[in-house]
Amino acid sequence: MSTIKKLYIKTWGCQMNEYDSSKMADLLESTHGYQLTDVAEEADILLLNTCSIREKAQEKVFHQLGRWKNLKDTNPDLIIGVGGCVASQEGDFIRQRAQCVDIIFGPQTLHRLPEMINQVKGTRSPVVDISFPEIEKFDRLPEPRAEGPSAFVSIMEGCNKYCTFCVVPYTRGEEVSRPCDDVLFEIAQLAAQGVREVNLLGQNVNAYRGATYDGDICSFAELIRLVAAIDGIDRIRFTTSHPIEFTDDIIAVYEDTPELVSFLHLPVQSGSDRILTLMKRAHTALEYKSIIRKLRKARPDILISSDFIIGFPGETQDDFEKTMKLIADVNFDMSYSFIYSARPGTPAADLPDDVSEEEKKQRLYLLQQRINQQAMSYSRAMLGSVQRILVEGTSRKNVMELSGRTENNRVVNFEGQPDMIGKFVDVEIVDVYANSLRGKVIRTEDQMDLRIHESPESVIARTRKEDEIGVGTYQP
């Protein structure tokens, strides 16, 4: 009797990495029959999907590999692979420091994992592939599998902006968009499996320019409308965006596409024009605020979250106060803030890191305190309002209750029926807590007027097909 082969994946970093890890698991199950396990000690393959955004990312990788080396010492047949952005950045240097590693692959070569594994098994020699083969990886991945009512779908890879603090262009390459029909096909497959909410992923999604079947180009604004037209997809999110490409055509989608949530994450990083110039962000604080004004005109109830880097080289107290003023002017909702630390290989790493750690921590505390106050104010303002939530499952705190999320990402716990899971309900917010809300159901999905346009099956049927020699046909 054959034993089940097991795969363990440890993932650090962004939602793109989470998406990539899920695709690795699906791919290796389809090609080799590997089943995911949560226990590293029982796995036949260990994969580490790394992130290079945080401080000391490389050292974190080697500490983890040191722990895994002990497992390989007791099981020489164990295969260890390192992927993600640190792998892309460091390449064979990882092997030099951690000879227990068999496979090193980048974000753009994860689709080649089956061949890499076969090569290691056959020759026991290590494999390194951190190339950037355009968008090839999406052509080689298995069909998507829904895991709950929400799903992430990658629409593009890479970034061309080259902000001075960021490693993404060097680790994930420049911007490459997936063909429009491929994206719609994947989302239609997910919708047919019961997915109700999709989060469109990319390092800079508003730069999306996807080829269509007839040789035209689909913009990001057009893509959102096409996704919204797929029956069952009644909530659309996207992340992440860059202000300089948040164009008026994207803002216009907020006027006519109710499936697009009234919540936007739009990183600004600093409120000081001088620091924004040093960061090579290519916009001013005033230009950022102009985008927000247009958005609020198109969608008055929209909430905005952002990213902030504290203590960038050369940041003075005046620069920081300008950031705090921007936070007050925009009145941001929940946001992410980080103390600056240099990323090797980035232009900012050559700048003198002249803000003391003590000063960075003090500024971070003040900023987070302000953001938390504003976010709590938004939560309190929701008391007594009616919110549409997507029911994700049972509540973490009480299995006799259900839990879901509002458009602005608040967790709402409420009493409901099990058949509500995976559907939308309207609830009245009756209590507000620090990390969640409490609601009372006032309307179920069958009482809603959700738009119906095109069935997932129809989208799947009209997707471009290729014959044995690669000639494409399209069925309108």
Curated annotation (Swiss-Prot):
Where does the MTTase N-terminal domain start and stop, copy by copy? 5-122
The record's Gene Ontology cellular component field reads: cytosol
Where would you say this protein principally sits, based on its record? Answer: cytoplasm
UniProt xrefs under Gene3D superfamilies = Methylthiotransferase, N-terminal domain, tm_1862 like domain
Q: Extract one GO molecular function annotation from the record.
A: metal ion binding
UniProt-listed SUPFAM superfamilies: Radical SAM enzymes
Q: Which CDD domains match?
A: Radical_SAM (cd01335)
Q: Which keywords describe this protein according to UniProt?
A: 4Fe-4S, Cytoplasm, Iron, Iron-sulfur, Metal-binding, S-adenosyl-L-methionine, Transferase, tRNA processing
- The species this protein belongs to is Photorhabdus laumondii subsp. laumondii (strain DSM 15139 / CIP 105565 / TT01) (Photorhabdus luminescens subsp. laumondii)
Cofactor dependency: [4Fe-4S] cluster
Which protein family is it in?
Belongs to the methylthiotransferase family. MiaB subfamily.
Under the heading SMART domains, the entry gives: Elp3 (SM00729)
Report domain Radical SAM core positions.
145-377
How is the quaternary structure described?
A: Monomer.
Say if the entry is tagged with keyword 4Fe-4S: yes
The EC designation for this entry is 2.8.4.3
Q: Which domain of life is it from?
A: Bacteria
- Catalytic activity from the UniProt record: N(6)-dimethylallyladenosine(37) in tRNA + (sulfur carrier)-SH + AH2 + 2 S-adenosyl-L-methionine = 2-methylsulfanyl-N(6)-dimethylallyladenosine(37) in tRNA + (sulfur carrier)-H + 5'-deoxyadenosine + L-methionine + A + S-adenosyl-L-homocysteine + 2 H(+)
Q: Where in the cell is it found?
A: Cytoplasm
Q: What class of enzyme is it?
A: transferase
The entry's protein name is tRNA-2-methylthio-N(6)-dimethylallyladenosine synthase
